[in-house]
Amino acid sequence: MSVRARVAALTIVLIAATSAMACGGRFFGKQYEYEEDLYLATDGSAELIVNASIPALVSLRGLPLDVDPATQVDRNKVRALYESPETEVARVSRSWSRDGRRFVQVRMKVRDVRKLDAVAPFSWSHYSLGEEQELRVFRQTMGASALRPGTMQNYGWKGKELVAVRLHLPSRIVDHNARDIDSNEGSAVQRGNILAWEQLLTDRLDGRPISIEVRMDRQSILYTTLWLFAGAFTAAVLLLCGIIWLTMRKGAREAATTS
Protein backbone atom coordinates (compact mmCIF):
# COMPACT_ATOMS: atom_id res chain seq x y z
CA MET A 1 0.00 0.00 0.00
CA SER A 2 1.38 3.43 -0.96
CA VAL A 3 1.96 6.18 1.59
CA ARG A 4 -0.88 8.20 0.07
CA ALA A 5 -3.28 5.26 0.38
CA ARG A 6 -2.26 4.67 3.99
CA VAL A 7 -2.84 8.31 4.85
CA ALA A 8 -6.25 8.20 3.17
CA ALA A 9 -7.21 5.02 5.06
CA LEU A 10 -6.09 6.50 8.38
CA THR A 11 -8.06 9.67 7.67
CA ILE A 12 -11.21 7.63 7.01
CA VAL A 13 -10.73 5.71 10.28
CA LEU A 14 -10.23 8.93 12.26
CA ILE A 15 -13.30 10.53 10.68
CA ALA A 16 -15.36 7.42 11.50
CA ALA A 17 -14.11 7.40 15.08
CA THR A 18 -14.83 11.10 15.52
CA SER A 19 -18.33 10.73 14.06
CA ALA A 20 -19.09 7.76 16.31
CA MET A 21 -17.97 9.61 19.44
CA ALA A 22 -19.86 12.75 18.44
CA CYS A 23 -23.04 10.71 18.14
CA GLY A 24 -22.46 9.12 21.50
CA GLY A 25 -21.04 5.84 20.25
CA ARG A 26 -17.91 4.21 21.67
CA PHE A 27 -15.39 3.48 18.96
CA PHE A 28 -13.11 1.67 21.38
CA GLY A 29 -13.92 -0.42 24.46
CA LYS A 30 -17.23 -1.87 25.53
CA GLN A 31 -20.42 -1.34 23.58
CA TYR A 32 -23.66 -0.68 25.44
CA GLU A 33 -27.25 -1.20 24.41
CA TYR A 34 -28.54 1.26 26.99
CA GLU A 35 -26.56 3.68 29.17
CA GLU A 36 -27.24 6.63 31.44
CA ASP A 37 -24.58 9.19 32.36
CA LEU A 38 -25.67 11.37 35.27
CA TYR A 39 -23.59 14.50 35.98
CA LEU A 40 -24.71 15.34 39.50
CA ALA A 41 -24.36 18.72 41.22
CA THR A 42 -24.26 19.17 44.99
CA ASP A 43 -27.68 20.89 45.01
CA GLY A 44 -29.39 17.91 43.34
CA SER A 45 -29.59 19.36 39.85
CA ALA A 46 -27.94 17.36 37.10
CA GLU A 47 -27.22 16.84 33.45
CA LEU A 48 -28.26 13.46 32.09
CA ILE A 49 -27.23 11.76 28.87
CA VAL A 50 -28.97 8.65 27.58
CA ASN A 51 -27.43 6.58 24.78
CA ALA A 52 -29.59 3.67 23.70
CA SER A 53 -30.79 1.55 20.83
CA ILE A 54 -34.37 2.09 19.76
CA PRO A 55 -35.24 -1.59 20.51
CA ALA A 56 -33.83 -1.13 24.03
CA LEU A 57 -35.97 1.96 24.60
CA VAL A 58 -39.03 0.07 23.39
CA SER A 59 -38.33 -3.10 25.39
CA LEU A 60 -36.91 -1.58 28.56
CA ARG A 61 -39.02 1.57 28.83
CA GLY A 62 -42.03 0.83 26.65
CA LEU A 63 -41.48 3.93 24.51
CA PRO A 64 -43.67 4.00 21.37
CA LEU A 65 -40.89 4.22 18.77
CA ASP A 66 -40.41 2.59 15.37
CA VAL A 67 -37.82 -0.21 15.68
CA ASP A 68 -37.39 -0.62 11.90
CA PRO A 69 -33.65 -0.04 11.27
CA ALA A 70 -34.46 1.30 7.80
CA THR A 71 -36.55 4.11 9.30
CA GLN A 72 -34.98 7.33 10.53
CA VAL A 73 -35.64 8.05 14.20
CA ASP A 74 -38.31 10.68 14.83
CA ARG A 75 -36.19 13.05 16.93
CA ASN A 76 -39.12 15.31 17.77
CA LYS A 77 -41.03 12.35 19.16
CA VAL A 78 -38.02 11.28 21.24
CA ARG A 79 -37.70 14.83 22.57
CA ALA A 80 -41.38 14.90 23.53
CA LEU A 81 -41.03 11.59 25.40
CA TYR A 82 -38.20 12.93 27.57
CA GLU A 83 -39.41 16.52 28.00
CA SER A 84 -41.21 17.16 31.30
CA PRO A 85 -41.59 19.69 34.13
CA GLU A 86 -38.50 18.08 35.72
CA THR A 87 -36.37 17.77 32.59
CA GLU A 88 -35.36 20.10 29.80
CA VAL A 89 -34.11 18.33 26.69
CA ALA A 90 -31.09 20.12 25.26
CA ARG A 91 -30.45 17.88 22.26
CA VAL A 92 -31.54 14.73 20.51
CA SER A 93 -28.79 13.45 18.22
CA ARG A 94 -29.13 12.09 14.74
CA SER A 95 -29.44 8.34 14.91
CA TRP A 96 -26.58 5.98 14.10
CA SER A 97 -26.58 2.26 13.37
CA ARG A 98 -24.79 -0.67 14.98
CA ASP A 99 -25.44 -4.40 14.58
CA GLY A 100 -28.58 -3.71 12.57
CA ARG A 101 -30.15 -1.46 15.21
CA ARG A 102 -30.57 2.30 15.34
CA PHE A 103 -29.23 4.25 18.32
CA VAL A 104 -29.93 7.74 19.58
CA GLN A 105 -28.54 10.07 22.22
CA VAL A 106 -30.67 12.36 24.41
CA ARG A 107 -29.11 15.15 26.48
CA MET A 108 -31.16 16.90 29.13
CA LYS A 109 -31.00 19.08 32.21
CA VAL A 110 -32.59 17.75 35.39
CA ARG A 111 -33.94 20.28 37.86
CA ASP A 112 -33.92 17.93 40.86
CA VAL A 113 -32.68 14.36 40.60
CA ARG A 114 -34.89 13.40 43.56
CA LYS A 115 -37.94 14.00 41.34
CA LEU A 116 -36.58 12.29 38.24
CA ASP A 117 -38.72 9.18 38.79
CA ALA A 118 -41.75 11.34 37.94
CA VAL A 119 -40.51 11.38 34.33
CA ALA A 120 -41.84 8.32 32.46
CA PRO A 121 -38.57 7.05 30.91
CA PHE A 122 -36.95 7.09 34.37
CA SER A 123 -39.88 5.87 36.44
CA TRP A 124 -38.20 2.47 36.83
CA SER A 125 -35.73 4.10 39.25
CA HIS A 126 -36.06 5.64 42.68
CA TYR A 127 -33.60 8.41 43.55
CA SER A 128 -32.57 9.98 46.84
CA LEU A 129 -29.95 12.55 47.82
CA GLY A 130 -29.40 13.69 51.38
CA GLU A 131 -26.95 14.08 54.23
CA GLU A 132 -26.00 11.35 56.67
CA GLN A 133 -23.24 11.59 59.29
CA GLU A 134 -21.76 14.72 57.70
CA LEU A 135 -21.61 13.08 54.27
CA ARG A 136 -23.74 13.53 51.16
CA VAL A 137 -25.37 10.24 50.16
CA PHE A 138 -26.82 9.44 46.73
CA ARG A 139 -28.92 6.34 46.16
CA GLN A 140 -30.61 4.98 43.07
CA THR A 141 -32.50 1.73 42.74
CA MET A 142 -33.36 0.69 39.20
CA GLY A 143 -36.27 -1.73 39.21
CA ALA A 144 -38.41 -3.63 36.72
CA SER A 145 -38.30 -2.99 32.99
CA ALA A 146 -41.38 -2.38 30.87
CA LEU A 147 -41.07 -5.76 29.14
CA ARG A 148 -44.14 -7.95 29.48
CA PRO A 149 -44.09 -11.77 29.22
CA GLY A 150 -44.54 -13.00 25.67
CA THR A 151 -43.78 -9.63 24.03
CA MET A 152 -40.05 -10.07 23.45
CA GLN A 153 -39.02 -9.69 19.80
CA ASN A 154 -35.87 -10.68 17.94
CA TYR A 155 -33.72 -7.58 17.53
CA GLY A 156 -30.48 -9.45 16.92
CA TRP A 157 -29.40 -9.46 20.55
CA LYS A 158 -26.99 -12.27 21.39
CA GLY A 159 -27.22 -12.23 25.20
CA LYS A 160 -23.95 -10.45 25.95
CA GLU A 161 -25.18 -6.89 25.45
CA LEU A 162 -24.59 -4.51 28.35
CA VAL A 163 -26.47 -1.80 30.20
CA ALA A 164 -24.63 0.85 32.22
CA VAL A 165 -25.36 3.61 34.72
CA ARG A 166 -22.52 6.08 35.33
CA LEU A 167 -22.31 8.77 37.95
CA HIS A 168 -20.09 11.80 37.38
CA LEU A 169 -19.83 13.10 40.93
CA PRO A 170 -19.00 16.60 42.22
CA SER A 171 -17.31 15.68 45.52
CA ARG A 172 -14.59 13.41 46.84
CA ILE A 173 -15.98 9.87 47.02
CA VAL A 174 -15.71 8.29 50.47
CA ASP A 175 -17.51 4.99 49.84
CA HIS A 176 -19.53 3.26 47.10
CA ASN A 177 -20.94 -0.12 46.10
CA ALA A 178 -19.94 -0.21 42.41
CA ARG A 179 -18.57 -3.59 41.32
CA ASP A 180 -16.85 -4.88 38.21
CA ILE A 181 -19.28 -6.98 36.17
CA ASP A 182 -16.60 -9.52 35.19
CA SER A 183 -14.76 -10.06 38.49
CA ASN A 184 -17.54 -8.98 40.89
CA GLU A 185 -14.88 -7.07 42.82
CA GLY A 186 -15.25 -3.49 43.97
CA SER A 187 -14.65 -1.00 41.16
CA ALA A 188 -12.11 1.78 41.36
CA VAL A 189 -13.17 5.39 40.89
CA GLN A 190 -12.44 6.31 37.28
CA ARG A 191 -10.59 9.43 36.22
CA GLY A 192 -12.96 12.38 36.38
CA ASN A 193 -14.58 11.13 39.60
CA ILE A 194 -16.74 8.63 37.74
CA LEU A 195 -18.33 5.41 38.99
CA ALA A 196 -20.05 2.82 36.80
CA TRP A 197 -22.61 0.08 37.42
CA GLU A 198 -22.99 -2.46 34.60
CA GLN A 199 -25.52 -5.20 34.00
CA LEU A 200 -26.30 -7.66 31.24
CA LEU A 201 -29.20 -6.52 29.08
CA THR A 202 -30.89 -9.88 29.70
CA ASP A 203 -30.87 -9.23 33.45
CA ARG A 204 -32.20 -5.71 32.92
CA LEU A 205 -35.01 -7.04 30.75
CA ASP A 206 -35.83 -9.54 33.52
CA GLY A 207 -36.02 -6.66 35.99
CA ARG A 208 -33.14 -7.65 38.24
CA PRO A 209 -32.52 -4.50 40.30
CA ILE A 210 -29.45 -2.31 40.14
CA SER A 211 -28.73 -0.85 43.57
CA ILE A 212 -26.51 2.24 43.63
CA GLU A 213 -25.14 3.95 46.73
CA VAL A 214 -22.39 6.56 46.99
CA ARG A 215 -21.15 8.50 50.01
CA MET A 216 -19.17 11.65 49.33
CA ASP A 217 -18.02 14.90 50.88
CA ARG A 218 -20.60 17.65 51.19
CA GLN A 219 -18.37 20.23 49.51
CA SER A 220 -17.62 19.94 45.81
CA ILE A 221 -14.11 19.23 44.63
CA LEU A 222 -14.11 22.58 42.81
CA TYR A 223 -15.11 24.43 45.99
CA THR A 224 -12.40 22.67 48.00
CA THR A 225 -9.83 23.31 45.27
CA LEU A 226 -10.68 27.02 45.16
CA TRP A 227 -10.27 27.29 48.93
CA LEU A 228 -6.93 25.48 48.75
CA PHE A 229 -5.83 27.77 45.95
CA ALA A 230 -6.97 30.85 47.88
CA GLY A 231 -5.11 29.63 50.96
CA ALA A 232 -1.94 28.96 48.99
CA PHE A 233 -2.18 32.35 47.27
CA THR A 234 -2.70 34.14 50.59
CA ALA A 235 0.27 32.31 52.11
CA ALA A 236 2.42 33.28 49.12
CA VAL A 237 1.39 36.94 49.40
CA LEU A 238 2.11 36.97 53.15
CA LEU A 239 5.50 35.36 52.53
CA LEU A 240 6.32 37.94 49.87
CA CYS A 241 5.23 40.78 52.16
CA GLY A 242 7.40 39.31 54.93
CA ILE A 243 10.42 39.16 52.64
CA ILE A 244 9.86 42.75 51.51
CA TRP A 245 9.47 43.93 55.12
CA LEU A 246 12.65 42.14 56.23
CA THR A 247 14.56 43.54 53.24
CA MET A 248 13.38 47.09 53.97
CA ARG A 249 14.18 46.71 57.66
CA LYS A 250 17.66 45.42 56.88
CA GLY A 251 18.21 48.32 54.47
CA ALA A 252 17.08 50.82 57.09
CA ARG A 253 19.49 49.35 59.64
CA GLU A 254 22.39 49.47 57.18
CA ALA A 255 21.58 53.10 56.33
CA ALA A 256 21.45 54.03 60.02
CA THR A 257 24.80 52.29 60.67
CA THR A 258 26.45 54.08 57.71
CA SER A 259 25.25 57.50 58.86
Residue ranges and their predicted role:
Residues 31-51:
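Post-signal peptide N-terminal segment of mature Sec-exported envelope proteins
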Residues 53-133, 138:
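Structured domain cores in non-transmembrane regions
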Residues 132-233:
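Intrinsically disordered, low-complexity linkers and stems that provide flexible hinges
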Residues 38, 50-54, 110-112, 169, ...:
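A mature extracytoplasmic/lumenal domain signature
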Residues 19-22:
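C-terminal motif of bacterial Sec signal peptides marking the signal peptidase cleavage site
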Residues 24-27:
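Bacterial signal peptide processing site
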Residues 1-10:
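Bacterial N-terminal signal peptides that target proteins for export
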Residues 218-259:
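C-terminal single-pass membrane-anchor helix
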